Amino acid sequence: MRGERRRRALVVVLVVLGLVAVVASPAAALHAPTHRRGPSASRSGRPYPCAPGPDGTIQGPNADASAIGWEGNAQGVVACLGGSFYVQDGIDTTYGYGVYDDTKTTWTNVGGYLPALRSTFHRAGAEISITNFGDDVQLASGAFVVVYSRVAIHNATSHAVMIDPQASPRLISLNLAPLRVGPGATVDHDYVVAADRFGQTTPWPTAGALQAAGGYDAHFAHMQAFWVAQLASIAQVRVPDPGLDDAYRAGFIYTQIVRSGDHLDTGVNGYASEYSHDVIGILANLFTQGDFNGAHDLLLEARDVVGTQGQYLDGYWTYSWPWAIYLLKTGDLALVQANFSTEGPDGTSTPSIEDTAHRIAADRVGATGIMGRTDDIDTLGSWTVDNYEALMGLAAYRYLAERVGDASEASWAASEYDSLLAATTATLDATIHRYHLRYLPCSMTDPNDFNRCSNAEDANWAAPFVFGRWAWDGALFGATITGPGADLIDATYDYGFGRLKTTLPANTFGGYPDDYYSSGYNAGYGSWGLASAAHRDQGIRSYEFMIQRTQSGPLSWWESVSAPNPASPWIGSHPARGQGSSPHAWGMANANKVLLDSLAAERSDGTLIVGRGIPSSWTRSGRSISVANFPTTDGHTVGFTLATHGLTVSWSSIGEPTTGPVLLELPTFVNNIRHVTGGAADRRAGTVTVAPGTDHVVVELAHPA
């Protein structure tokens, strides 16, 4: 999908006779008319549009789209600007408030990251905010995702104002609030509507049942507590850019809302389905973060997806990768052994880990021995990225074979890896020599001028750098990293950005037809930068670009976007068009993985790499970085802080003591270490090696960062 394709419930006990009644049709009692409270001095209007467009993708007229809902809901709710939202699950209806009139608006996640989206604007001297969120509500009739909505009107004037929220007729009132708002006062209008049934066919609840299930504040508190607890279970980050902290948290939450049961869908609209390589990338990131909730079912669901979907072969080849991360982090050898060489109930359509690795050998072609032609970047070709993905799959498979004690398969994987690496290197060397190239081409056999990468703004020029995984993630699993894919990383970044210098801002890689400004994978394209010398912080810089320039919902991004629309009512820089889905779970997975990898990454031998991708500006005096609850080998976790005071950078371990070596590899350390206390320095490489169990290291710099 790089171009043109594509509970912890608040239990409510209802004891009032009749309140547990349900109806079969959502158009009846579920959507009872809003209680009207007299005339309003405000003009009457329709809610801001939020509905499917000609291509079926749900969004607002300014390409605005995000999501609210609950973990594992069948169909998340699409949220748009101005407090409007679109409920799916057979209801297929837009809800919103006519009081919103497309005036200049801020649109944010409450608390910076929660899936409670707030639009704030001004009218008649009043500040009006509309907040929507989803909560998991258990009624006697079943489990539901219920949307709670508040229109808060604050009168900052010295005279009374009359403002009617003008709620959609089928929204259900939760309180009787006046339309008159006195000077300096705030009035809250609260509403509710059921939105999802977790894939069941349970009849929808009545208006009375929803009203009796509790008010806005109680459900907000439950929603907030749930997501805070979920975030506490994964690796936590704090960096000098708080926008990245919030994006990391919001990305995890959106992924859980986009998820439909055990199906790791890519979006709640547009791409509301599973795609093989998307699922692999999403799962790899969740395991890297330390989210193993339902891991067994998710791994087997991924098996079913890669085994039956013929669209993308690379998902099949890399199926071993999330398994390897899972085993490294959890030590759950029994689960891996049970699925290593044993197929699922449908034979090769539910392949074993071994099946997927051996498919790599079967898919190599011709005298060159490279991977065959695929449509993995949504255009048929002999793509460089495919060969590096296959190498990644083999590296992960070798690790798994060694861990389960299958010496024969480990030997086969090592031999196949060496053979494919040699073939890849020879073919690329020949292409580079024949056409006098100074970059890694996106095709194995042709220069970029001969294919879709001739368009400088087509981000596939950097496809190996995110989807290939190999140069960075392969190295983490002990793979040999040599050849053009290792040698030309910096040169290829320079080449690609050089072509974009006159057409696009810095730190965007371009997009896909016909929205070439940027993409949801923009941060992920910096992944191979972690294996480079000069672009180690590219992932973070490109993530910051996404936050500053291309949000299409609060901390939510389309797969591909056009340039910003200055006429949008949403204050800031936001794309005029988008395609795919927003939020986009695979894009967020790549962004959050490169952020976390830039701060902390673990090798399969237990070595912890710290700070390899952090910008030098983050180590200026007075700044600090922390990582907590980072998952390491066999179920352990570690944490640390990095703090700079003057020319001194201090690393301190928090939580469990480290059990393996720690490598402090901050870019600012390269040729800039004066003295180290608590570790051994390689000044030229800029690496400080810390022995296991050490809890404090001090590095004195020669020059300021």
Predicted regions and their residues:
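The feature captures the catalytic groove of carbohydrate-active enzymes
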Residues: 180, 184-216, 309-314, 358-419, ...
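Terminal accessory carbohydrate-recognition/targeting modules of carbohydrate-active enzymes
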Residues: 30-245, 604-705
